[in-house]
Design a protein with these regions (language model features):
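Hydrophobic hinge/microswitch elements
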Residues: 18, 27-32, 37, 96-153
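Extended ligand-binding regions for polar small-molecule ligands
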Residues: 84, 164, 168-190
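Secondary-structure junction motif
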Residues: 39, 43, 83, 87-112, ...
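Flexible hinge/capping segments at coil-to-helix
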Residues: 49-91
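Short helix-loop capping/hinge motifs at secondary-structure junctions, enriched
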Residues: 72-81, 159-161, 172-178
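Central regulatory/effector-binding core of bacterial HTH transcription factors
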Residues: 1-45
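Beta-alpha-beta core module
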Residues: 45, 52-58, 62-64, 124-173
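Short hydrophobic/charged patches on amphipathic alpha-helices used for structural packing
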Residues: 23-27, 57, 83, 126-127
């Protein structure tokens, strides 16, 4: 998207944040838009927060859960995995800070108890731990090999859940051409 505009000057900020920070940043106009997901576990709480902050959610796509693992993970050759298959491996998740409720969790299966847990703040650390410790995280399955390389792969997770990934924006506002181009790029990628 940045190359698309080929401007002599620009000032973009791309943040990877906790769920509540995404909502706060869009509500307080620190960010033009945010990307998050809704599930049967978090939908009611997140929609209530969005309404209270005069934000709207626009679904981009629905996905069945997948896991990200390193390409040489012992389960990498499987066509799908179960939560039981993953029991011996470290579960990597995003820290939610003082908003520790599973309603803010970035992972769909946050209510499932695990023996090995590691919480991180950013994707680079998560991917490094996935490769170094044979860890895994639960995700939408969308990955850019152009950005992340071939070291991380996605495997379908055999659970009866879904995630609706979408954008949040302020009510009654129009996106800038940069914001719209970003969303268009996401739509093309999925």
């Amino acid at each position: 998207v940045i190359r698309e505009f080929d401007a002599a000057r620009y000032d973009f900020t791309l943040r990877e944040e906790q769920t509540h920070e995404i909502i706060e940043d869009v509500a307080h106009m620190k960010s033009e838009l945010g990307i998050l997901y809704l599930s049967e576990h978090n939908r009611e709480v997140i929609e209530r927060m969005l309404a209270a902050n005069e934000l709207v959610f626009e679904g981009l796509f629905c996905a069945t859960p997948h896991v990200f693992v390193c390409a040489d993970h012992p389960l990498a050759g499987r066509s799908s995995v179960t939560l039981e298959d993953l029991e011996d491996y470290p579960f990597l998740s995003y820290e939610q800070g003082s908003y520790n409720s599973f309603y803010y969790s970035e992972e769909l299966t946050s209510t499932f108890e695990r023996r090995k847990n590691i919480r991180v703040r950013d994707r680079a650390t998560l991917f490094n731990l996935a490769m170094g410790l044979n860890g895994y995280t639960v995700c939408s399955g969308v990955i850019s090999h152009e950005l992340n390389g071939p070291g991380i792969i996605s495997i379908p997770l055999d659970v009866d859940e879904y995630m609706e990934i979408g954008i949040i924006t302020r009510k009654n506002t129009t996106l800038t051409r940069y914001g719209q181009a970003y969303i268009d790029a996401i739509r093309q990628h999925i």
